[in-house]
UniProtKB/Swiss-Prot annotation:
Pfam families hit by this protein: Hydrophobin_2
Any GO CC annotation of this UniProt entry: extracellular region
Keyword Iron: no
Domain of life: Eukaryota
Keywords: Cell wall, Disulfide bond, Secreted, Signal
SUPFAM superfamilies (UniProt xref): Hydrophobin II, HfbII (SSF101751)
Organism for this UniProt entry: Trichoderma asperellum (strain ATCC 204424 / CBS 433.97 / NBRC 101777)
Family: Belongs to the cerato-ulmin hydrophobin family.
Signal peptide as annotated in the record: 1-16
Protein name: Class II hydrophobin 4
Gene name of this polypeptide: HFB2-4
Disulphide-bridged cysteine pairs: C29-C78, C39-C69, C40-C52, C79-C90
Amino acid sequence: MKFFTAAALFAAVAIAGPVEVRTGGGSICPDGLFSNPQCCDTQLLGIIGLGCEVPSQTPRDGADFKNICAKTGDQALCCVLPIAGQDLLCQAAVGAA
């Protein structure tokens, strides 16, 4: 009986452990809600993105993301959920300031 308890505990710990290793670098947008990189024409009230599109290239870092969006006159933002070119919740991309 103790063996099954120990085996179940070991299996639970193994399953609960993270599968991928995160180094902390190279992330443009934070994980979670604001995980969609967008190039937006304008940002209203600091939270609403208008005229948003996916970047034309895959950015390497925040500065590259800012440069990609700047080519079309847009701002580099991380948004919650793009709907028809409008994003209700956006924040500045990491390293794009």
